[in-house]
Amino acid sequence: RVSYEHDYESHGVVLGASRDYAKHNTTLSFNVMGSRDLAGRAGEIADAHEKVTVEVLDREGISAAGMGGLEAVSKGGQHVEPRLITLKYTGRGGGKVLGLVGKSVTFDTGGISIKPSGGMEEMKMDMSGGAAVLEALDAIASLDFAIDIIAVLPSTENMPSGTALKPGDIITQLNGKTVEVTNTDAEGRLILADAMVHCAREGADRIVDLATLTGAVLIGLGSTYAGLISNDDDLAGEIIAVGKRTGELVWRLPLHDEYKDLTKGTITDLVNASSQRKAGTIYAGSFLEEFTEGKPWAHLDIAGTAWDT
């Protein structure tokens, strides 16, 4: 927990500026804010703060690391330039290391399972989770909070092409679990899965991921509440309480074995999308729980709130 009990004015200026910068970056077109640009912004943050370091993997590094989800989603052509961005802030909090993971698909066409053309221009906002994580880290470092953080942004485009990921393809995620890809437009969970495992292996004790993950959360909660799914009551309770204080409201959705059963494959460990339309947000969260590495974890589906101004 971080205290805000002193110097409200300076805290407010920093937090407000970081929020506005995140929202600004979310509205930028892909040709202005692509994966390389996100990596560049991460580098700017690291250069500005001595307690922040950054490491960036390109396509070759992602493949060598065994991040099969991020690698597969990035197969939509040689112009796609994926990045795995890892920042570490060492504030010497002396407590548990917080992991933040932000989905950073800089443009999402849906891939071979292509989206309808109407409204597709808004899919530049599919990197909202990554934008939020980047600017949150910048604010935390600017305020010199006594907390240690690992932030991971899996960044790519989801594009159709002759080389793109196809329905029916089988991939192996970083933790060794196999996934049959039944819908290439359910790509966010594939890249988040690798990023969450990476975050845990880098030393995170607790993980919070932010992602514009499902349209289903918009149907269920609109743009007032973000969806929250968690395997840990204490962590979920902290997030709910902070949301009430700040106006960033969240609504907790359940995890249950019957939902988890829907994610199981017949020829693989998992399938990335269900043939059924029901409980889409919970399905995605249940899929992600397979990649927590046993850590307390919370998933925030911000598909409804990220684009709300």
Per-region residue spans from a language model:
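Phosphate/ribose-phosphate-bearing ligand recognition and processing surfaces
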Residues: 1-52
